[in-house]
Amino acid sequence: MARTGFQGRKLGEAFEIWTEMLREENITILMGLSGAMVPAGMRKIIAWLIRNRYIDVLVSTGANLFHDIHEAMGFRHFMGSEHVNDCKLFEEGIDRIHDVFAYEKEFNVIDYTLAEIISEMSGVMSSREFLEEIAGRLNVKDRNSIVIAAYESKVPIFSPAIADSSIGIAAALAKREVVIDTIRDVEELTEIVVNSEKTGVIYVGGGVPKNFIQQTEVVARLKGYDVRGHEYAIQITTDVPQFGGLSGCTFEEGVSWGKISGKAKKVQVNCDATIALPVLAHGLIGIRRQKYPIFNGL
């Protein structure tokens, strides 16, 4: 595909860059995950990427992780339609995510299940530690799960805006003694980047996960470390840069901030991630990574 035109070429270039990252001996690959990717059916792909160490760190919205836990506990999202009477859906207790449906009462079961788990936790934790605790306490029915794959593979997950999700709602319902310190997230993720010889980033969408990874280079520089910016970069987005939003921000703009290396191998794929991600994952099947980082210090 890299020898075709338009976004087909960009998708092919993304595959080539990802493949090159996997062949590097001393690199940490960080993925930012935003948008409703789990309801859209991308959950098993992300879990597979984690288990096979095609990525080493995940920064995600809390919503994707909540929906992942929802399915891990045996519930499902359903194929629906955007051409419906939403007032009728509300009366029937059905939540709509574009053309995907889910039952509100099932979401509520997960809300209260998480609230019960959180009530048993205490202390000050990063979101990574918090999510590891939850994953270790869940009695799951489906292990094709992002949080379970990460827990079992020792791949750290950060969710710096976790309060902005149903996991945050569950925490608000809990009789909680646990405190989630998101500044500790900043410190932990920056430490991972600083201790990596090279870093590569893959962004599905943008938002908080993207900037949280991007800013590690700035934090490291302010702390006195000699960093060069991320050296590989892939973004899959449907947004454009003209309106100033981060989700459409180009990697060229990131170079001006020192977040992306001026010599980085980079590509932006303007495509629906539910199209691009399965194609990329299919291409990666035959590639086996020989060496990946182990985060003993976390």
UniProtKB/Swiss-Prot annotation:
GO cellular component: cytoplasm
Class in the EC hierarchy, top level: transferase
Pfam families found in the cross-reference section: DS
InterPro entries per record: Deoxyhypus_synthase_arc, Deoxyhypusine_synthase, Deoxyhypusine_synthase_sf, DHS-like_NAD/FAD-binding_dom
Keyword Transferase: yes
Family annotation (Gene3D superfamilies): Deoxyhypusine synthase (3.40.910.10)
Catalytic activity field: [eIF5A protein]-L-lysine + spermidine = [eIF5A protein]-deoxyhypusine + propane-1,3-diamine
E.C. designation(s): 2.5.1.46
Record: active site: K259 (nucleophile)
Protein's pathway: Protein modification; eIF5A hypusination
GO molecular function: deoxyhypusine synthase activity
Keyword line: Hypusine biosynthesis, NAD, Transferase
Listed cofactors: NAD(+)
Similarity comment: Belongs to the deoxyhypusine synthase family.
Function noted in UniProt: Catalyzes the NAD-dependent oxidative cleavage of spermidine and the subsequent transfer of the butylamine moiety of spermidine to the epsilon-amino group of a specific lysine residue of the eIF-5A precursor protein to form the intermediate deoxyhypusine residue.
Protein's recorded name: Probable deoxyhypusine synthase 2
